[in-house]
Amino acid sequence: MAHDEQRWLSPRLQKAAALCNQAPAASESPLWLGIDLGTCDVVSMVVDRDGQPVAVCLDWADVVRDGIVWDFFGAVTLVRRHLATLEQQLGCRFTHAATSFPPGTDPRISINVLESAGLEISHVLDEPTAVADLLQLDNAGVVDIGGGTTGIAIVKQGRVTYSADEATGGHHISLTLAGNRGIGLEEAEQYKRSHAREIWPVVKPVYEKMAEIVARHIAGQGIVDLWLAGGACMQPGVHELFRQRFPALPVHLPQYSLFMTPLAIANSGREKAEGMYAS
């Protein structure tokens, strides 16, 4: 049965946002760690036995591009820093972590980073599948719009039957904004986050392209729901654009969608790797 969006998912996402780079919530063992290596950010999240977030570390970082870790040393350094912070905050030691990868890319890319940071892998799966598993969907589509790619998964009778990845995401939003305003890419990234409503007319065509990509992948699949996830979905205007493009489908976009994939990864470790938790 699908998790209830308002009673189960939204409170967990809201809690993750409140905990981000802050003091952890009170918790008891066992605890599970998930690490999301994104194009624009690295997020490490710890959840408890109920799948509730208890600690979250986030760094905006340019270490992954289009599913490829181009700054391996930088990625390992960030993961080690997150690990040290979480262990100090929670008073425990993490030996295992779950992670994910964009569909169609090599999972060893993420695995190598975590292993180089001193962690063993408790579970690894592609990003939209992680979200689909978290939501416990049936006959639905999941669209994970991250920094560098848009991942699509089709779920039938509780199982992921199709997944794909397209090289369009938040990074391309920043490129469009940088060109429009005549500014550097790093400045565009910061401007995007602080002037989200203002930039919508400029970046809307990129999201329209994303919606057309999604339409191509879900055509004929017979899904009855469409879920959006990923940090790039937090741009005001995205939900309404997808609702207009897919009028026959309920389109779900929970608040704080930036944390959906990290929450899904951490929960995948909890559900698939019982016993591989903090000590």
Where are these regions (language model features)?
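Short beta-strand scaffold segments in enzyme catalytic cores
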Residues: 42-47, 150-154
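Nucleotide/phosphate-binding catalytic cleft detector across ATP-hydrolyzing
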Residues: 1-37, 48-142, 159-166, 170-279
